[in-house]
Amino acid sequence: MKHLLTLTDLTKNEISNILEVATQMRRIVAANYKKGPQLIGNVVAGIFPSPNLSSTAMQLATTYLSGTPCSVFGINDELGQCHTFDSMGVNTLVINCANDNLAKSFAGKSRCGVINGGSSQYDPIGVLADLMALNARLDGLQNLNVLAVGNRDVNKINELIHCLQLYGSNLIWFLPPDDFVTTRKGIVLDKAETAFAGADAVIDLGLAAFSEAEKYYGSVGGISEAFMDKARIRCPLLGSRYVVDNVGIKEYTHNIVSSRETCYVSVLMAVLYLMHKD
């Protein structure tokens, strides 16, 4: 694997291989002594708009594999910084930038490996982390109906649709009928009761600015517990730790947010290892 730009370019075998290696890497993350020798002598650089999950995971993943991390934040000339890192001889570059074309165009002529750490249309590491967390909780990714709710982190949608279809599963997206701004992709339902009914897992994408939470979640404070009750028993929830009942906001027992954060680091470790190995 030379680059990882989008999961829509990968086959089922390639995705399964990353998840399998990530499962092994998770043992390092869970261990008291978090060190593996896989990236000794390697430099992993990152370009990020500000400190975030992607930048933190890059630092941890590289350190856990005995590599050397190097990050910059808030750079105006991202492409120029990419070329600077490449000329410095870094082994891998993680790019977290809204511009979808940046990572792709740079990867076409770079000497270093390139990982898309999140852009306006794609989030390969984040989606793999979602899949890994769901795989662990649901004992596989086959024959699932996964429900996405919200309209903020829509850069996950295309890759989730692609990956779940490879495993014979479906992504269903709930959007209220009066959301005329969000571009609809895949299977979209506009009735919450129908969308949540029988869902095997729920992913909260968050809400864009000026969106009315009650129209998406059934309540102002987050996803309504009444909606979650329509899903399968012990339905896992990603993207949020909380639901809202008739009393107020409470932690949802079956949320897997913490597991997903661990999976995010593990997946990035797996990708770094596979790129170095090849």
Spans of model-derived segments:
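Short hydrophobic/aromatic-enriched beta-strand-loop microsegments
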Residues: 112-118, 171-172, 253-259
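Phosphate/diphosphate ligand-binding glycine-rich loop within oxidoreductases
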Residues: 33-135, 233, 244-247
